[in-house]
Each structure stands twice: as structure tokens, then as C-alpha cells.
From Swiss-Prot:
The chain crosses the membrane at residues 4-24, 29-49, 60-80. The lineage of its organism: Bacteria, Bacillati, Chloroflexota, Chloroflexia, Chloroflexales. It catalyses: a quinone + NADH + 5 H(+)(in) = a quinol + NAD(+) + 4 H(+)(out). It is an enzyme of class 7 (translocase). NDH-1 is composed of 14 different subunits. Subunits NuoA, H, J, K, L, M, N constitute the membrane sector of the complex. This is NADH-quinone oxidoreductase subunit K. GO terms for cellular component: NADH dehydrogenase complex; plasma membrane. Its EC number is 7.1.1.-. It comes from Chloroflexus aurantiacus (strain ATCC 29366 / DSM 635 / J-10-fl). NDH-1 shuttles electrons from NADH, via FMN and iron-sulfur (Fe-S) centers, to quinones in the respiratory chain. The immediate electron acceptor for the enzyme in this species is believed to be ubiquinone. Couples the redox reaction to proton translocation (for every two electrons transferred, four hydrogen ions are translocated across the cytoplasmic membrane), and thus conserves the redox energy in a proton gradient. InterPro entries: NADH_UbQ_OxRdtase_chain4L/K, NUOK/Mnh_C1-like. GO terms for molecular function: NADH:ubiquinone reductase (non-electrogenic) activity; quinone binding. Its main location: membrane. The keyword Transcription does not apply.
């Protein structure tokens, strides 16, 4: 059986990659994917801890977090498509103002 510390280490690495993606990239789609990577890293850590200590309750919480993440993806991609249609760019610096 794989130790929990390996899962937590992998989760920390994935979360760090997500943070770097948010901080260093200017494309809104890449930033959106980095945020999703951070959310999935947190889910991985929660499942790893649940396997060792908490049991089924934490796995149910992860299921609901994944459900909320799916809704977030739907809304986020709809917003990105709408912004891209009006501004013709996905650059975060170019679309930072919300003027009509």
C-alpha cells in the first residue's frame, strides 16, 4: 500500500504548479486550468487524509466538492467564451476592466 505521505507530497506539488500557473500566466484559460488544478490537489489531499483517519465522510465531502467544481467549470467557461467574443482576447491584462 502506498503511504499517505506520498499522496500529500503529490498534492503539494500539484498545488504549487497551480499557484505558479495563476501567478505567472496571463492567458485566462490557463489561469482557469491552474485554479482547477489547485482544487483537485486539495481534493487529493483530503482523500489521502480520509483514507487514513476520517473515513467515508470526507470522501462524501470530496464528491460534493467535485460536483461544485463541475458547476464552476461550466460557469467559468461560459464567462471566458463571452469575454473572448466581446474583447477578442483571452489575456487577463486586457480584460481586467469590466466596462461594457
Amino acid at each position: 500500500m502506498v503511504p499517505t505521505s506520498y499522496y500529500v507530497l503529490l498534492s503539494a506539488i500539484l498545488f504549487t504548479i497551480g499557484v505558479l500557473g495563476v501567478l505567472l500566466r496571463r492567458n485566462a484559460i490557463v489561469v482557469f486550468m491552474a485554479v482547477e488544478l489547485m482544487l483537485n490537489a486539495a481534493n487529493l489531499a483530503l482523500v489521502a487524509f480520509a483514507r487514513e483517519r476520517l473515513g467515508v465522510e470526507a470522501q462524501v465531502i470530496v464528491f460534493f466538492v467535485i460536483t461544485v467544481a463541475a458547476a464552476e467549470v461550466a460557469v467559468g467557461l461560459a464567462l471566458l467564451v463571452s469575454i473572448f467574443r466581446t474583447k477578442r482576447t483571452a489575456d487577463v491584462d486586457e480584460v481586467s476592466t469590466l466596462k461594457g
